[in-house]
Regions:
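Non-catalytic nucleic-acid substrate-recognition regions in nucleic-acid-modifying enzymes
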Residues: 2-142, 385
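Flexible, glycine-/basic-rich loop-and-beta segments that form/coincide
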Residues: 48, 53, 162-167, 171, ...
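A short, flexible beta-alpha/helix-coil linker loop
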Residues: 100-103, 162-163, 309-313
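C-terminal edge-of-domain segments
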Residues: 144-160, 372
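SAM-dependent Rossmann-like transferase core, predominantly class I methyltransferases
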Residues: 155-189
Length: 385
């Protein structure tokens, strides 16, 4: 088995730098590219990054890359890779995804079929199995992906399984919730730190508040999750347990937090409470049923983070316009507070009544959104009477 792997952490557009910082914080050098962060590591790195990365989507092993302008080149390129170092006899290895962009090969089902045939032939040769008899695929699953960009094929194995945004604490969700990894990334892009008050005035199922509490408490986001690699014979159960135990020991149970989530919908408030309970942070967050226009605070240097309803999520345009105007009026007196508002509404600033200090383009799934950033006038707390 291999001792070092070429690895990729995939990321939503606009979040690559956040994921890169997280990878470096774990001690791995990396290169940030569009939609991905490349790094190298051993089996422990595979476990740690799946367990700890908050903003990434998946961790993939790069088995190899090669030119592939024809199906013959694709077959020979896949066949030449060292599959015996990854796939034990009996493994299931579906070619779960093929993607062709700006390439001569563009029939994705054919790319999948030929890649599968090449892997089968390589394993038959390595394990001395007759070519005419199909391999028994009854063991652990290794999902293989083939990406062909500008006639260069990259072949990968997904180590994650269910996407990393599925933390395992969501009991229920609202109509269009923000993904957990997107919420964690926005918190890291904001100027919030655990010693500052945090309010989400349109909290829905509570994702921003829960992710903030998990960040503050140093809770590994994957601690409750299971991963594809846990079924693989060359990833030892002892090492997995060791990394999980180390992560559990890092949880900070002493820190005091000031996090509040509000929503006009009483049912969503109850869902948010249940989700926080499932995440183990119920005691860190105050959830209230409250309208945006009723929000007040005499605290300073806080942060407001909101993913309010917008056009694609709400059919009532007049209601959205009214909500944005109310936000502008209610947030204006909170001069020392920074505000971070995520919406796809390109007219948000005019409806809110103030231009943003900074705007950042992101994607919530396939939907293009902007993070409107308004920075507070920071003061020393003792200066405030």
């Amino acid at each position: 088995m291999k001792e070092q792997f070429n690895l990729i952490a995939t990321a939503a557009a606009g979040l690559e730098a956040v994921v890169g910082r997280e990878v470096r914080d774990l001690g791995y050098d990396c290169q940030v590219e569009n939609g991905r962060v490349r790094f190298q590591g051993d089996v422990r790195a595979i476990i740690e990054t799946n367990l700890w990365l908050r903003a990434a989507d998946r961790i993939k092993i790069v088995v190899g890359s090669f030119p592939a302008k024809t199906f013959e080149e694709l077959f020979q390129g896949v066949f030449a890779l060292d599959w015996e170092n990854y796939l034990p006899l009996g493994a299931r290895f579906p070619i779960s995804k093929a993607k062709c962009v700006k390439s001569k090969l563009h029939n994705e089902p054919s790319v999948q079929a030929i890649s599968k045939k090449a892997v089968v032939k390589k394993l038959q040769k390595h394990y001395a199995r007759p070519e005419g008899i199909p391999l028994m695929e009854t063991g652990p699953e290794f999902k293989i992906e083939v990406s062909i960009l500008k006639d260069v094929a990259t072949v990968m194995i997904d180590t994650t399984g269910s996407s990393l945004f599925k933390r395992g604490y969501r009991t229920e969700k609202g109509g269009a919730p923000i993904k957990e990894n997107m919420a964690a990334a926005i918190l890291q892009l904001s100027n919030w730190y655990p010693d500052k008050p945090l309010i989400d005035p349109t909290c829905g199922s509570g994702t921003f508040c829960i992710e903030a509490a998990m960040i503050a408490r140093k809770m590994a986001p994957g601690l409750r999750c299971s991963f594809a690699f846990e079924e693989w014979n060359w990833v030892s159960d002892r090492l997995i347990q060791e990394v999980r135990t180390e992560a559990a020991k890092k949880i900070d149970r002493e820190i005091e937090l000031d996090i509040m989530g509000c929503d006009i919908d009483a049912r969503m408030v109850e869902i948010a409470k249940a989700n926080a309970q499932a995440a183990g942070v119920a005691g860190d967050i105050t959830f209230k049923q409250m309208r945006v226009q009723d929000l007040r605070s005499d605290k300073v240097n806080g942060v407001i983070i909101s993913n309010p309803p917008y056009g694609e999520r709400l059919s009532d345009d007049a209601g959205v316009t009214k909500l944005y105007a109310e936000m502008g009026q209610v947030f204006a007196p909170l001069k020392t507070w920074s505000k971070f508002i995520l919406t796809s509404d390109e007219a948000f600033e005019s409806k809110y009544g103030s231009p943003a200090d900074k705007k950042r383009k992101l994607y919530n799934g396939t939907l293009k959104v902007d993070l409107y950033q308004y920075f507070g006038q920071r003061v020393k707390r003792q200066e405030v009477k």
